[in-house]
Structures are given as structure tokens and as C-alpha cells.
Amino acid sequence: MCLRYLDIPGINDDTDYLKIVNKYGDTIYRKPHFRALEELGVSAKFIQTADSDDVKKQIDLGLPVVAGILHHGAVSDPSGGGHFVVITGYGRDYWLVQDPYGELDLVNGGWAATGAVAGRNIRYSFKNLNPRFFVGGEGSGWCWYDFKRVK
């Protein structure tokens, strides 16, 4: 999603990107992503201390943010190995999210609907997404941000 935003040649969906990442290792680790981005001529930063203001600042600059979330379990006690979504906007009380896997059931965990179309332009309330993103409270979010072309 972020690479399409930058109009990187040969990247039409996350499948194209994952083929490159898989050359360098498991997708759950940062290093293969950094190496894949480098191959594609893109730089990005990864932090584990993001808060809502950090995300909003990137969005206000016109840059999407890839947010790590826990997608299993109830919103009151999220769990799971993790999943990443792309935040492309926000409103007074929601994040605008893109997810090629589908639409999340934020209250109960899991998926409300699967498929790329199901995950387009979903408005997730701060109330229900933030506990899955900022699991340890504000300032504990894992995200990729500041995507730039370097070639």
C-alpha cells in the first residue's frame, strides 16, 4: 500500500512486495523488510514508541503509516502474533485504514470480512483500534513511517 503510494514500479499489491521480502527472511522480522525496501529504492523508519500524534503528523504530511496491531481476542484484552494495517487518514474519532486482508472485527477479534475490497477505506474508531495498536498505552505503538524514495 505504501509502495503504491510512492508509485514504485512492479509493486501492484502486497503479494509483489512479499515476494521480495521473502528473499531476505521471514516477514515477521524488520530486517527483511528493510532489505526489501532498500532493493526497491525506498527508505522508511520503524519505531516501537509511536503515539496518536506521531501518526497524525505523518498523515498531515500526506504520508501513510503502517501500524502493527494485535488482531485476536476481545478489544479489552487483545492478543495474537500481530498484523499490520495502513493508516491513510483520520477524523475526529476514527482512523481511516487500508488492509489487503480484509475488515477486522475490532470488538471481538478476527475478521468481519476478508478480501482486499473488504479492507478498503475502513473507518475504525479510536476507541476500538487504539487498544490494539497502542497495547501498552499511548507511546507504545509499533509502526513503519516516513516512507521516501531514495533512488
Region spans (language model):
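Active-site-adjacent substructure of cysteine-protease-like catalytic cores
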Residues: I47-V107
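Noncatalytic regulatory segments and standalone regulatory/sensor domains
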Residues: Y24, D60, P78, Y90-K151
